[in-house]
Amino acid sequence: MSRTILKIPVSSPRMLASAIGVALSAGSAAHLAQAAENTEPKGERNPISLGATNITGQDQDNTSYQVEKASSQKYTAPLVDTPRSVTVVPQQVLKDTAATSLQDALRTVPGITFGAGEGGNPQGDRPFIRGFDAQGDTYLDGVRDTGGQSREIFDIESIEVSKGPNSSFGGRGSAGGSLNLVSKTPQARDFTNGGFTYGSDQTRRCVLDVNRQFLDDSAAFRLNLMSHEQNVAGRDAVNYDRWGVAPSLTFGLGTPTRVNLSYYHMESDDLPDSGMPYGYGSTASNAAHVHDKPTDGGDSSNFYGLKSRDFRKTRADISTVSIEHDLNDNMTLKNTLRHGSTGQDYVLTQPDDSQHNVNQFGTVWRRANSRVSTTTTTTNQTDLFGNFQLAGMKHSYSTGLEFTGEETRVSGYTVSPNSNPVCNVSKGGMGGNCTSLSNPNPDDAWNGNVARNYNGTNTKATSRAAYVFDTIELDPKWLLNVGLRYDTFDTQANTNAATGRTKLKDDSQFFNWQAGLVWKPTENGSIYTSYATSASPVGGLVGEGQEPNGFVTGINTSDLEPEETVNYELGTKWDLFHDRLSLTAAVFRTEKKNTRILVSSNTFENGGESRVDGLELSASGKITDQWQVFAGYSYLKSELVDPGRIGNRQNVVSAGSNKGNQMPNTPKNSFSLWTTYDITPKLTVGGGAFYVDEVYGDAGNTVYVPSYTRYDAMASYKLTKNVDLQLNVQNLTDKTYYDKAYSAHFANQAAGRTALLTTSFHF
């Protein structure tokens, strides 16, 4: 085999791990020696945390799972008075569950699933919120974070999940909701925290979190480091290797003017896993999927990739400058400037069944998918927020302007041979392009070639927006929450292919709003009703994914309008047990209208509709001083009301329809429960149960992944004032289940039983 590969540089994470180890060892020795000489109690410190190896400071008093207010100034009221469903996954939940990635963290939030990536849909995070694709609706500290990524959380303090359409908050997209990742920032205290995690399947993770004040405590520097490598429990050959660094610097702590500078860098080098092929309910050579689930040939550890061919390398670089000034006691002006660049480079095996090899011959075609992509984004966001009194009513407001430029370049590799072979041969046949369903060998020799193909697509987008939010206290028992946003979104895609060049463009303008009325029968509770909208214009993902309203080569899409989503919601929120436990309940209807549908060959119209009726419940916080819980339930009744014709634009099926089918990636029922109990001041035990109903991968409801229940357990023990031990066992029963469904061909299998032991240091 020969291949020419454009590599995204990935430095050795072992060097970073060694550096973390040296720093921790030196710091531990110095502080332990000091502790031996001086046993006087130190001043109170706030919680400090480190992702999966979260370490808390001394005399911790903020380990609750309850969060009272979102970080973004666009939320102009505490969560109990916010008329929409918002779930915040706090640092303590990330620590206790040993989460290391965004997908790990969101397991604790029911109603969210993840879709699988391929070639056109990039590998990485592809969340579905309330049944709607949200891969372009992730924000970092309130600024859209574009580009296909598998996000780490070593530098993340909390994750905010806003459910329901909310284009008034972030602009385009957000049909089902959005995610906001809150970064760790410099603090007004000194600390050094670190952790080593050793686990099954050669898991090794090191983290370091250092914060230091200087300039007479008016400035602070914080540094987060991470090194992570692991194989995957229950999966042959698959491995993940990544490292990251995130320095940040703040000037003006405790003063009216504050300046924050931050940088985030992460690289990964993986042998990726696309999981298992779907089986067919029939052995006929021309069988179509009817109601088929993945098949592993009798061994759930089977891996259908090739070590000699497959790889995935990623990188992310994000630089941010934020300046905040208090104009007076009731008004603050803030400007955030960010430049980000993310990249992916991969060739991976898709266990393909399109030639019916699985059911006819018991074999799998190792189809090669590839991608080389780079996304750059520059955003400037200016916000003015505060509060004032007018006509006897209190206003808590936030208003701002946003300007963003985005560009994505996508190309790939030419992999040959990569045609659709009929694999009527034994494993390793066809030059390694075919393998056995029941006994694949990832070490098979592959007699092919991988060469860089620079033909691809360059997509650019420019957006401009103005927005305003206000919570008006009509009287002590009634609140009115409103939000308005106006966007212009101009995008252009230039395609360079062997058949020639094409140029597509679209200019959209859209207005979104939200309104909610809140009644507070008591100070610690509320009952609300709300309405919110979102808009998804043509090309909203800027080339980073296959979207329902994306550009179509050879078709005029300039006349297509933004897809529109509306949400009606009725809910209630209560803070009980001395305001330490938050309980919420909501019923809602989300309707996506004006969706683009296929009506005939090469003809699309804005005439489709889909709908989700749902119920959500949640609980977060402390039941007693020793016992706390983070739990939720989601019921989603989804329906494709008018999905248009079946088929693709060149091959339209004249008869038949998916009308009335369940929406893909939308479980009817999902449930999560995580709870811990402090048996003694030093010993804590906990556990979790996570249930997800059957999920369809396609609009035709012909392929699906079965429902599953996963159980986790944890125990932590404080060895000393400065050293903790924590044991986590994830997927306690070693359940074989699938956590990502693709519309055809395959589904991703989740990890088996994984044990993790973390030693944490905090000074």
Where would I find each of the regions flagged by the language model?
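Structural signature of Gram-negative outer-membrane beta-barrels, strongest in the C-terminal barrel
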Residues: 250-254, 375, 394-396, 400-406, ...
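Acidic, small-polar-rich N-terminal luminal/periplasmic segments of exported/outer-membrane proteins
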Residues: 25, 50-189, 534, 570
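Outer-membrane beta-barrel translocator/receptor signature
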Residues: 154-157, 168-245, 253-257, 317, ...
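Membrane-embedded beta-barrel scaffold of Gram-negative outer-membrane proteins
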Residues: 323-328, 332-338, 342-348, 527-528, ...
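C-terminal beta-signal and adjacent terminal beta-strands/loops
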Residues: 690-698, 716-763
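Face-selective signature of the C-terminal outer-membrane beta-barrel domain
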Residues: 319-341, 368-494
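Acidic/polar loop-and-plug regions of large Gram-negative outer-membrane beta-barrel proteins
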Residues: 228-233, 240, 245-326, 341-375, ...
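Gram-negative outer-membrane beta-barrel transporters
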Residues: 589-591, 606-699, 733, 760-762
